[in-house]
Amino acid sequence: MNAAFPSPSERRLQPAAACFEMERRIYPAEQDSWIMRTTEPSLPEQTGPPHNPGLKRLIEAKREWHHRPDAEAGEQGFLGWHERGYLPHFDAPNVTQFVTFLLRDAFPVTRRREWEPLLREGNESLRKRKLEAWLDRGHGECWLRRPDVAAQVEHVLRAEDGRTYRLRAWTLMPNHVHLVVDVWQTPLSSLLHLWKGRSSREANKGLKRRGTFWEREYFDTLIEDEVRLRRAVRYAENNPVKAGFVCDPKQWLWGSARFRDEYERLPSERTAGTFTRAAG
């Protein structure tokens, strides 16, 4: 067994191939964690991703073929595959996730005609690149450009690193955040609630403002092997380079790359091994 990742039987996950095949039949051309649809004729005014009318069928298929939380995980608050009206989410103990969450105005309603067509792109890889390019243009207030605000958010993200979860990588961009995180015994949705709640309170104080700081929805992708882990870490840490802010990831002041040693390890990984899980 690969020591870096728990086996599928340990996570109680069924092989995903059948689920993905079902997904292709139910939801053609929109098959990844960025799944969003915008074909409804009367969409409400909003800044975030539009409502996804086919989402419930997709989640039902994923639950049938891929994962259902056991009683113990359910008691801890893990939901397995679930949705909150816009995007599919996966939540289980002892897994690694790639997560992206945004400032509230990263997709401003005033420019909806520009960003909405990006969500209809049928090619998964191309859609991700287009969405990332949109975010990297820095729409909205971009409060994370301010060093004091970025420092507060990063402090909150790292506060429980190694105790409640383990961060494998992170990058704060002007209007969004990328994380690669080992989820242990606290549901990802609870971690996001914690991170967003604490950081928004501190950020709003510094900005002398009130109101919503973060977009409610987020994007998450389950990472199931070492190859995908390395790819996710590289993607997150290279985002400032791709956006043209720096020439080397280690030059970016609000990311994990600057903490890596000559073996590319973060401080929390130097004593923890390649993959660690909470006891139990």
Question: Where are the model-predicted features located?
Answer:
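Short catalytic/metal-binding and nucleic-acid-binding patches
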Residues: 1-280
